[in-house]
């Protein structure tokens, strides 16, 4: 979805669509099981060897781990893709700006997170719609939904809200970005890097996004139910990591050469980070003998 949204905006702005798609597909490729909770757990486990970063691991995957050619490791991606993965958007204002395509993927990622985290919060009943309607962005979206589709049941109204949240952000960014690029008239990527420019929503929508994100942080991400789930997930990752470090024979045989090359501790982190949630849980139960409660 991030790739689709970013390409749509990039096409209208006449940016490099192929680069946008490659960057979007690489964007979260390095995430371990359980997303950011898993990343924090692995980083804590690996603190003595430099920690763990899903961005850096994403680079490791496409440059070293994936083997598609007989003459060299990695996927043979272009310098622009690799640079985009390495140089994510830093809004501190220091250092050169990343390419516009990198910035656009970051903006599209923010859009989808806001929309789907709102959706998940409602589906899990962590918050209710009455609470969300106090927020300007949600109130704006629901007003539109109700004007177009009167009498929707709660489930369909929620889905329509999510669609409108995405649509509103896309239209806003298309308008804002188009005007900004017309004013700036960048001639090269070096012009972008040397500027103070960042792809961001309009000031009005940006303020409403920040209000929504603050609400989600306080009332969803810090919800006691999610904190408990996060803690359990992190404990499982730490337990399985310790098992692999203590007994490297648990690694599949084909991973042993890399384990000898980069060290057992780093290999344990990489191997776990490459798992899906489902495969991790199956592996955890098999190796530890502990059943994960549904």
Report each predicted region and the residues it spans.
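Histidine-centered, transition-metal-coordinating active-site segments
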Residues: 1-9, 14-18, 38, 52-294
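Aspartate-rich (DDxxD/NDxxD/DxxxD) Mg2+/diphosphate-binding motifs
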Residues: 19-48, 55
């Amino acid at each position: 979805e991030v790739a689709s949204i970013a390409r749509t905006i990039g096409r209208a702005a006449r940016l490099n669509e192929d680069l946008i798609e490659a960057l979007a597909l690489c964007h979260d490729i390095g995430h371990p099981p359980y997303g950011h909770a898993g990343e924090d757990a692995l980083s804590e486990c690996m603190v003595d060897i430099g920690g763990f970063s899903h961005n850096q691991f994403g680079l490791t995957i496409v440059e070293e781990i994936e083997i598609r050619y007989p003459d060299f490791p990695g996927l043979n991606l272009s310098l622009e893709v690799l640079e985009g993965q390495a140089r994510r958007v830093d809004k501190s204002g220091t250092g050169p700006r990343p390419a516009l395509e990198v910035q656009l993927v970051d903006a599209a990622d923010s859009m989808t997170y806001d929309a789907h985290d709102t959706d998940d919060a409602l589906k899990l009943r962590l918050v209710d719609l009455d609470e969300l309607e106090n927020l300007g962005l949600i109130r704006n979206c629901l007003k539109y939904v109700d004007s177009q589709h009167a009498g929707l049941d709660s489930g369909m109204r929620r889905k329509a809200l999510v669609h409108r949240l995405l649509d509103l952000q896309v239209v806003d960014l298309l308008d804002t970005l188009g005007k900004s690029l017309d004013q700036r008239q960048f001639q090269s990527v070096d012009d972008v890097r040397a500027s103070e420019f960042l792809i961001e929503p309009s000031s009005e929508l940006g303020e409403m996004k920040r209000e929504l994100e603050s609400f989600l942080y306080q009332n969803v991400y810090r919800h006691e139910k999610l904190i408990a789930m996060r803690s359990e997930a992190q404990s499982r990752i730490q337990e399985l990591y310790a098992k692999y470090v203590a007994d490297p024979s648990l690694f599949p045989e084909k991973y042993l050469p890399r384990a000898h090359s980069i060290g057992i501790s780093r290999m344990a982190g990489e191997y776990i980070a490459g798992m899906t949630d489902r495969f991790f849980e199956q592996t955890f139960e098999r190796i530890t003998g502990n059943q994960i409660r549904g």
